[in-house]
Design a protein with these regions (language model features):
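Short, glycine-/small-residue-rich phosphate/pyrophosphate-handling segment
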Residues: 81-134
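Beta-strand-loop-alpha "switch" segments that mediate conformational coupling across diverse proteins
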Residues: 133-145
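Conserved beta-strand scaffold positions in the cores of enzyme catalytic domains, especially
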Residues: 7-9, 132-135
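A short secondary-structure junction signal
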Residues: 65, 111-115, 146-147
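Short, surface-exposed amphipathic charged segments that create phosphate/polyanion-binding patches used
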Residues: 148-156
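C-terminal beta-strand edge segments of enzyme domains
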Residues: 144-147, 174
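Short, catalytically relevant binding-site loops at active-site mouths
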Residues: 59-61, 107-109, 141-142
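N-terminal beta1-alpha1-beta2 submodule of the flavodoxin-like/Rossmannoid cofactor-binding fold
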Residues: 1-79, 83-86, 155-195
């Protein structure tokens, strides 16, 4: 019998999370000093998770501002020391998490997601060598649920978007592969974590 993994969904746009103020109090008290928002609840969910999956559209070459607010508060998970050569990041506790980054963007060039991937690469490394980052980028995605559209629906959409009709067939197959990659990643991580 297969076990089911427990999953908590957090919608960044609905979470009440105050912007990081850069006060650096977290360097002294080993947690974020900001009170009165959803961070304490989110923090516990993050710390108790084996897998952290982040999904975001790429808007103007970066992730959404609500998600960025949450990521900025990750600063409180580590001590940051300024040195003559740069910054040393030391997590308050050992992290061994799988970070999953699922990005969708209108651009047909996956390289346009690089700034977001670079941010998550930095974050997973700063939180310790026990972490891993798994990234999947969907390209030429302009509307909600486009990745699951039929080939005919894609053709109709592409006419409205003034995209060449032959791209619909190419993108339909690419989207099927993308969805299968997401499924395979989820299944693989669930198996690694005993679900």
């Amino acid at each position: 019998m297969e076990q089911q993994a427990h999953c908590d969904e957090v919608f960044a746009g609905r979470a009440t999370v105050t912007h990081c103020r850069g006060c650096l109090k977290c360097n002294l008290i080993q947690r974020c000093a900001i009170k009165g928002d959803d961070w304490d609840t989110l923090r516990l969910k993050i710390l108790n998770s084996d897998v952290l999956a982040f999904a975001s559209p790429i808007y103007f070459h970066h992730l959404t501002s609500p998600l960025k607010k949450i990521l900025d508060r990750f600063r409180s998970f580590m001590h940051v020391q300024i040195t003559g050569e740069g910054l040393n990041h030391t997590p308050w506790q050992e992290w061994k998490k799988h970070f999953v980054l699922l990005l969708s963007q209108g651009s047909p060039d996956a390289a346009d997601a690089k700034p977001v991937i670079d941010l998550f690469t930095f974050l997973t490394h700063a939180l310790g060598p026990g972490n891993s980052l798994h990234t999947i980028v969907g390209t030429r995605l302009a509307v909600s649920k486009q990745v699951a559209m039929s080939q005919d629906d894609l053709r109709s959409l592409y006419l409205k978007l003034e995209l060449p009709a032959p791209l619909a067939e190419i993108d339909y197959e690419r989207n099927r592969t993308l969805l299968q990659s997401c499924f395979n990643l989820g299944r693989g991580l669930a198996e690694k974590n005993g679900a």
